[in-house]
Amino acid sequence: MAEAATGFLEQLKSCIVWSWTYLWTVWFFIVLFLVYVLRVPLKINDNLSTVSMFLNTLTPKFYVALTGTSSLISGLILIFEWWYFRKYGTSFIEQVSVSHLRPLLGGVDNNSSNNSNSSNGDSDSNRQSVSECKVWRNPLNLFRGAEYNRYTWVTGREPLTYYDMNLSAQDHQTFFTCDSDHLRPADAIMQKAWRERNPQARISAAHEALEINEIRSRVEVPLIASSTIWEIKLLPKCATAYILLAEEEATTIAEAEKLFKQALKAGDGCYRRSQQLQHHGSQYEAQHRRDTNVLVYIKRRLAMCARRLGRTREAVKMMRDLMKEFPLLSMFNIHENLLEALLELQAYADVQAVLAKYDDISLPKSATICYTAALLKARAVSDKFSPEAASRRGLSTAEMNAVEAIHRAVEFNPHVPKYLLEMKSLILPPEHILKRGDSEAIAYAFFHLAHWKRVEGALNLLHCTWEGTFRMIPYPLEKGHLFYPYPICTETADRELLPSFHEVSVYPKKELPFFILFTAGLCSFTAMLALLTHQFPELMGVFAKAMSDIFCSAEFRDWNCKSIFMRVEDELEIPPAPQSQHFQN
C-alpha cells in the first residue's frame, strides 16, 4: 500500500509539473477569464478607481522617498551580489533559485536520470570528471618550518589555508599511523599529534615521543637462553617524530636534513623488522605498510633537501634509487621531482626518457608532464623561431610539433602560461593541488619558470602560440580536443586551497550573472527617478498622475502618448512653441 501511494503521489506530481511546464499559457488565460467573470463580485472597477484617487493625492515628496528607498535597496542587493560572486563565483539569487525554486517549478533530478539512463560512455566520463576534481598531494611541496613559516615571519601573511593544512593532517594520519600504534607509547603519542591543530602542541608531542624512548623503552633480554647474563637494549626511536620536527620545527633546510637523516636510521630499522613479520597476520601487514610509507617519505624529502642545498646530482641518484626500490608507490609522484632535478642539470635526454615512461595514455596526466614535453619540443626550434618568418613561409614539421605540444599543454592546464610569461604574480605553492586548476599552475611555474627562461626563445614561442588553443575548443566545458572537457569544479576547490590575498585564475572567464546586471540597472534607474523627482517635483508629479490614470482608468485604450504630454502641458501652463515664418507659409 505504501509503495502504491508513493507511486500515485509521484505520478500526480509529475502531471502537475508537466502542466506547469507546457501548459502555462492555458493556465494564464484561465486566470484572466476568472478575473473577468468575477470582476463584479470582486469590485475590480471600484478598487481601481480608489487606487487612482489615492495616487492622485500623493505629493512629490512621496515619490522622492519611494524612488530613493528603491535605489538604496537595489544598491544593497547589488553590493551583496557582487561580493558573493567575487567570493564564490556564482550569483546568490541564481543559486537559491536553482536549488530551491527549480524543483518546485519542474526541475528534473539529474542524479536519478543519470543513474537510470546513463550509458557506459557517460559513466566513464563521470569517473574521469571525479578523478580530475580530486585534490592531490603536491609532489614539490615546501617545508613548513624552513620555508612557509619564514614567509609568514617576513610578510605577515599565511601562505597556507586551513583547508590545505587539514588535508595534510589527513594524509599524515593515513600514511604514518596504523591500528597497532596504541601498543607502542611513542606511536600512540604521534597518532594524537597528527590530529593536533596547534603547531606548538604537535612539536611538543614529537619531543615527548622521543623522550619516551630514553625513559620507558629499556627492555632486558638474555644474551644466552640459559644464562644469567643480561643486556640492556633500547627500542628503536620514533621515526615519525623526527619527520614532524624536520617539517615544522627546523628553520633551515640544513636543520631539516639533519633531522631527516636521524629519521632515516629509525625508519630503516622499523622497516626491516616489519618486513620479516609482514606475513604473520593482518596487523603486521598493516604495520609494514605504514613503515614502508614512512621510509619512502623520508628518502624523498632527503632528496628534496639535497636539491634545495644545490647537490642536484646527489638528489637525482637518490630519486632514481627510490623509484627502483619501490616501483609500485606512484602516489608520491617521485618522477615529477626527478624531472625538475634533471631539467636543472640540463640533462634533456634523461628527461625525455622519463617522459617516455610516464607520459602514457593510461596514466593520469599533470602539468609537469605536459609542459615539460612541450618545453623539450620547443627547445628544438625556439632559438630560430620568428613569427614573421613563420607567417611568410609557414611552419616546419618541427615547429608544428612544438606548437601542437604547447596547445596540448595549454588545453590540459590553461592557467600556466600567464605565470610563465609573468603576466600574473606568483605565490608560494600550496601543499595540495587540483589538477588542471590554478593551484597546479602555481606549483608548476614556481619551480619550472627558471627552466623555461634557460631555453632561449621558449617563452617567446609560448607567447606567440598559447592563445591559439582556445580557438580549437570554443566550448571547453562541453567538449575538449585532446582531453576530457574542462571540469567546472576547479574554481571552487582552488579558492579553498589558495590564500585569500591571491586572485584565483578562472577558466573559462565567467560573464556577470543576470541578477547583478539587473540590480545594477534597477539601482541606476530608481536613482535617476529620485533625482528627477527631487529636481522637478511638479513635472514628475503630473507625469506620475497621468501614468496612474492611464493604467487605472477603464478607458485606458483610448489614450496615447500624445494625450499624456498634452495633459502635462495644460496642467503646467506651458505655452506652445512658436512656429517659424517658413512653416506658416
UniProtKB/Swiss-Prot annotation:
CDD domains: ST7. GO terms for cellular component: membrane. Pfam families: ST7. Keywords: Glycoprotein, Membrane, Phosphoprotein, Transmembrane, Transmembrane helix. The chain crosses the membrane at residues 15-35, 62-82, 512-532. It is a multi-pass membrane protein. It comes from the Eukaryota. Coiled coil: none annotated. InterPro entries: ST7 (IPR007311). Glycans are attached at residue 47. The modification Phosphoserine is found at residue 386. It is found in: Membrane. Belongs to the ST7 family. This is Suppressor of tumorigenicity 7 protein. It comes from Papio anubis.
